Amino acid sequence: MTQADELRRLAAVLRAEARPDLTYMEVCGTHTMSIARYGLRELLPDSMRLVSGPGCPVCVTAMADLDRVVALARLPQVTLATFGDLIRVPASRTTLAAERAAGADVRVVYSARDAVQIAADEPAREVVFAGIGFETTAPTIAASLLEARARGLANFSVLSMHKTMPSPLKALLELGETSISGFLLPGHVSVITGTACYEFLARDYGVAGVVAGFEPHDVLRALLRLVRQTTPAIEIEYGRAVRPEGNVVARRLMEQVFAPSDADWRGLGVIPGSGLALRPEYAESDALLRFPLELEPPLEPAGCRCGEVLRGVTDPADCALFGARCTPEDPVGACMVSSEGACAARYRYRGLDD
């Protein structure tokens, strides 16, 4: 059976078994892109709606945090290293790309270890790694920080803007803006966290969840699992990579370096305990403490509905800026910049994902 045949078969089963008025939310940016790329919405029954959630790390980074990154990049002694997606995300008044063009030392790296090596190669520079992401990337950044300390690289520091995934799901359910029937839970994050952290969804809110892989058949199979649940529960579809216990070693490494902290999420505001701050014993490597900055109040772009898209209450195409004033080439909001953003996915695959 070809992949196309399998997708048609799964879609037919979904159409036959789906109940009325189902709304499922995917909370992983890679799922968002896969759903758009393969036009999966077109295969779903009319009674089923898929909405995007707060699963894109760049997208959920608050404007105030982006402004801090820009301010750090402007310091003459600082080399600002970060992942490529962050370069073009609009802060209140500029972007890292614009600052680099104006002379700031901003470098794209593929891992935090690359930033550690820059610090080793250029001891006269203060190398700051701007870290974003969820539990997927936090352990690798923790390992890089420990490596820098072991190598005696006092010129390396981390600005941690990391967030933890289960927290925004609770915030969304508490808000109650969208009636969510179930969640497509993130595969990469769950490799690290396991599934125990999601149990509250079914226990406290009566909302089901299935950890899904990223191939189109993974997504449809996960949706079918959600449809077939008679009692809300947390299941794993992505069994080839995810175990209920997760990656204990990676979590211990993360917990050695980071501690829970309050974090500001685009579209959701401050969620207590949803961030990852460096522990006090790593204060000398904490760019937030090492480079105290006075920042102007953040400015949100007029008309941008990225925050609503991240909460699942607005479809990207319903934003007046979408595809006109806001495009991947000239983005207004973060959801149009990131490769995992809902607006970027919808724009790139428009026609397939309408």
PLM regions with names:
Residues 1-124, 138, 150-151, 159, ...:
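Metallocofactor- and cofactor-centric catalytic cores in central/energy metabolism, strongly enriched
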Residues 28-31, 134-136, 162-166, 187-191, ...:
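Glycine-rich beta-alpha junction loops
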Residues 49-52, 106, 151-158, 181-183, ...:
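Short hydrophobic/aromatic-enriched beta-strand-loop microsegments
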Residues 50-57, 156-163, 210-217, 237-240:
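A generic structural motif
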Residues 65-68, 120-127, 171-175, 198-200, ...:
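Short, surface-exposed amphipathic charged segments that create phosphate/polyanion-binding patches used
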Residues 121-131, 136-186:
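Active-site histidine-anchored catalytic micro-motif
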Residues 177-242:
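A conserved active-site cap/scaffold subdomain adjacent to cofactor or substrate pockets
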Residues 220-308:
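Internal helical hairpin/lid segments
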